[in-house]
């Protein structure tokens, strides 16, 4: 069900970088992400499962077939892509991440998963920034993607509008942009929400109301049909944007 207070449209703003680092260029941003995940990537999936809620619900919204192309921006360890690859008809799967370190783990995990399911879906991984997404240049695709995912990624991007713009530009008309990210937690106990926000800030993760507002405006502008679903009493939201 859609959240009645937020089932409107969307429209992002200017952009520069897609990492939580405010460095001067892409190289600085990639280095910052590598520094953050160099050690934690080894236990990332184990620790994140307890507070990155709604990821599997997001994946349930991804429609795949032998001919579909699905991209996850900020794919991290490829956890979500590996789950999609386990489907009987996963289609073509792609992952983009700013961190070389995370992609090293993603490549290893996806290779291990392929051994367990011979003939299953294969995952193409590339290093790059979200706002610089280019299907042809990065992945050699002459066609746009059918589905693009952001899973708890936009809340780590200070210049997230560029990431949304790039995703929309690389999505086919009628294609779907899916986002799961932290919400305002206003239906949760105040003490819990406050403690959660303090803890997440240690990892440079913040709820960004402006992201939600921009997604609402994107729908109002006519660029896409936008709906929101609450996860765990507004702990997080799942946004579905169908490109017009």
For each feature predicted by the language model, list its residue ranges.
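C-terminal alpha-helical "lid/dimerization" subdomain adjacent to the S-adenosyl-L-methionine
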Residues: 178-236
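A short acidic, Gly/Pro-enriched loop at the edge of an enzyme's catalytic core
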Residues: 131-148
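C-terminal lobe and adjacent flexible extensions of AdoMet/dcAdoMet transferase-like proteins
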Residues: 239-244
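A short SAM/SAH-binding and catalytic strip from SAM-dependent methyltransferases
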Residues: 146-159
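A short glycine-rich, Lys/Arg-flanked "PGG" loop and its adjoining helix->strand segment in the class I
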Residues: 161-173
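Class I SAM-dependent methyltransferase SAM/SAH-binding core
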Residues: 71-73, 77-133
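Conserved class I S-adenosyl-L-methionine
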Residues: 12-65, 79-83, 192-198
